[in-house]
Regions:
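Tandem repeat scaffolds
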Residues: 1-361
């Protein structure tokens, strides 16, 4: 088998099976649409090679040079690409499924709509690249370098990023689902419409960060630093911010339904029109906080410091309301109409009205 023979077979649509190309030079060749099964590409030079829509199954590509290679819509399944060089390669719409890519270099590569599924990416490098709509599904990135990358609509599902370098990265509409980012320093970072659903952010430093309209549903932010963050209209339902320092932050119109805020310090923060329904505010400090039109309906307020700016602040059904707030002109203690609506709703649930076909309820 020679490089020329290989190209001829690919052009004829013949699959390449159990061949060794070890040490070959395939620079600049057009191998688009090739099907490679258990082929040994270790150490092969494929600089500028065209592999569009090619398929690689159980191939070894250790140390392969794919600089500037065209790999659009290529598919890799159960392949080993240890220390592969993919700098400046085009990987748009490519798929890596159950591949081993430790130490691989994707610097300056175009990684648009690329999918990494259950693949190992430890110590890999994406520095300075574009990750646009890229999916990392259960693909470890421990020790990887994503510093200076632009992440736009990228998705990380159950990925451990605690030891991943993220300095200088740009986050736009990025989604982190059940991923771990604990301990990272994100101070003064900009997060545009990002989602951290059920993510582990324990101990992260977000001081001065911009997080307007970001979603932290179910996220763990224990002992995190949120001092001076700009996060209006952010969502924190069911999030755990126990012991978090959020002094001087801007959270106007943000949502905290059923959030755990025990021991959180919101001193001097702006929290106008925030919703704290059923939130655990045990020992929470709102000293000097602007709580104009905030709603603490059914929240737990045991030991909370509410020496704050209060104006039409709702405490409907709140538990353990501090005595100092009783009779405060800025507080709306209960809403009689809402109480009646809740009573009626509970009664209707216990005694539903029979519904007959042809009738309306």
């Amino acid at each position: 088998m020679t490089p020329h023979r290989l190209q001829t077979m690919v052009q004829r649509g013949e699959p390449i099976r159990e061949r060794s190309c070890k040490g070959w030079r395939l620079d600049g060749m057009d191998l688009s649409g090739g099907v490679f099964i258990e082929v040994d590409f270790d150490g092969v030079s494929c600089i500028g090679t065209r592999f569009e829509e090619s398929q690689f199954e159980r191939c070894t590509l250790g140390g392969v040079r794919l600089n500037d290679a065209q790999l659009k819509k290529a598919a890799f399944s159960q392949c080993a690409l240890t220390s592969a060089d993919l700098t400046a390669a085009v990987l748009d719409d490519a798929v890596f499924h159950r591949c081993k890519l430790p130490g691989s270099d994707f610097s300056q590569a175009s990684v648009v709509d690329t999918k990494f599924m259950e693949s190992t990416l430890s110590r890999s490098r994406f520095a300075g690249g574009l990750l646009d709509r890229t999916l990392f599904f259960q693909s470890p990135l421990d020790g990887a370098d994503l510093s200076g990358t632009r992440l736009d609509k990228a998705v990380f599902y159950q990925v451990d990023l605690r030891t991943t370098a993220l300095g200088g990265a740009r986050f736009e509409r990025v989604v982190f689902v059940e991923s771990r980012l604990g301990g990272h320093d994100f101070s003064r970072h900009h997060f545009l419409l990002c989602q951290f659903t059920d993510a582990d952010l324990e101990g992260c430093n977000f001081e001065g960060a911009h997080m307007a309209q970001c979603n932290f549903k179910g996220a763990r932010l224990r002992d995190a630093v949120l001092r001076g963050v700009h996060a209006p209209q952010a969502l924190f339902p069911e999030a755990d911010l126990s012991g978090t320092d959020a002094r001087g932050a801007h959270f106007d119109q943000s949502l905290w339904i059923e959030a755990v805020l025990a021991g959180t310090d919101f001193g001097g923060a702006s929290m106008q029109q925030c919703i704290f329904h059923r939130a655990d505010c045990t020992g929470t400090s709102f000293a000097g906080t602007d709580l104009t039109y905030a709603d603490f309906s059914e929240a737990m307020l045991a030991g909370a410091n509410l020496d704050a700016r209060l104006f039409r602040t709702q405490l409907h059904g709140a538990r353990d309301v501090p005595d100092a707030l009783r009779g405060n002109a800025g507080v709306l203690p209960n809403d009689p109409d809402l109480f009646e609506a809740q009573r009626w709703s509970a009664h209707r649930t216990r005694h539903p009205t029979p519904f007959t076909k042809g009738e309306t309820q």
